[in-house]
Amino acid sequence: MDAIVKNFPVLDDTGRPTQKEAEEAVRVLLRWAGEDPAREGLKDTPSRVAKAYREIFGGYDLVAEDVLGRTFEEVSGYDDIVLEKDIPFYSHCEHHMVPIIGKAHIAYLPNGRVLGLSKIARVVDIYARRLQTQEAMTAQIAKAIDETLMPRGVAVMIEAEHLCMAMRGIKKQGATTLTTTFTGAFKSEPAEQVRFMTMLRGFK
C-alpha cells in the first residue's frame, strides 16, 4: 500500500496564484478553445470557474488526521466490524481533470476505540476533493484511518465511473472501476475479507 500512497507537497498561500491570476488562466483556456471570453455569456465565467475550483479542490486545505483525531472509547465492548457503505463522492482525474463519480465502502475492526460515523465520510471527501487516481485515493483513505485510529484492520472498496473514459478516448459510458485495499486482519485473514464482501452484498 505504501507504494501507492502519494504524499505530494501542498503549496502554501505564498506559492499559490491569486484569484485574479486563476481567472486570467481561464480566459486563456477559453481563447485557446476558440471562444471569446468577453462575450455576454462568458463574462463572469472565469470568476465562477475559479470559485468553483476552490470548492471542488478544497481537500488540499484539509488534513485527514485532524478530522480523525477525536475518537470514542466507550463502546461497551464492541469489537466487531464497523461498516459504512455507499458513501457518494465526486473527484477529478489527475490526468485529464475530468470528474470521477463513485461511492466508497469502508470498514474497520475496532481496537478499543471507534470513530464518529461522519468522520469516515469526511475523510472520503477530503481525498476526493483533490486531483486523484482511484488507486491512490483508496490507499490514502485506508492509510489515514489505519494510522490514526490504529484498529485491528481496515478495508476500503471504491467503485467509480471515470468520465475520462466516458467523454473522450475510448468513450465507454457506464464502465465501473473497482479498487480495494486491506490492512491488518482484513489483509492477513481471508475470512475477514469474505465477511466484508458478504456484508456489502447483503445490504445491496
Swiss-Prot record:
EC number(s) recorded for this UniProt protein: 3.5.4.16
Sample GO molecular function, one term: GTP cyclohydrolase I activity
Q: Which GO terms describe its cellular component?
A: cytoplasm
N-terminal signal peptide:
none
One matching Pfam family is GTP_cyclohydroI
Which keywords has UniProt assigned to this entry?
GTP-binding, Hydrolase, Metal-binding, Nucleotide-binding, One-carbon metabolism, Zinc
Question: Which Gene Ontology BP annotations are present?
Answer: one-carbon metabolic process; tetrahydrobiopterin biosynthetic process; tetrahydrofolate biosynthetic process
Q: Which residues form a coiled coil?
A: none
Q: Superkingdom of this entry's organism?
A: Bacteria
- Group of enzyme by EC: hydrolase
Pathway this chain belongs to:
Cofactor biosynthesis; 7,8-dihydroneopterin triphosphate biosynthesis; 7,8-dihydroneopterin triphosphate from GTP: step 1/1
Q: Which reaction does it catalyse?
A: GTP + H2O = 7,8-dihydroneopterin 3'-triphosphate + formate + H(+)
Annotated Zn(2+) binding sites? 93, 96, 164
Which family is this sequence assigned to?
Belongs to the GTP cyclohydrolase I family.
What does the annotation say about its assembly with partners? Toroid-shaped homodecamer, composed of two pentamers of five dimers.
Identify the HAMAP family for this entry. FolE
Q: What is this protein called?
A: GTP cyclohydrolase 1
- This chain's source organism reads Rhizobium meliloti (strain 1021)
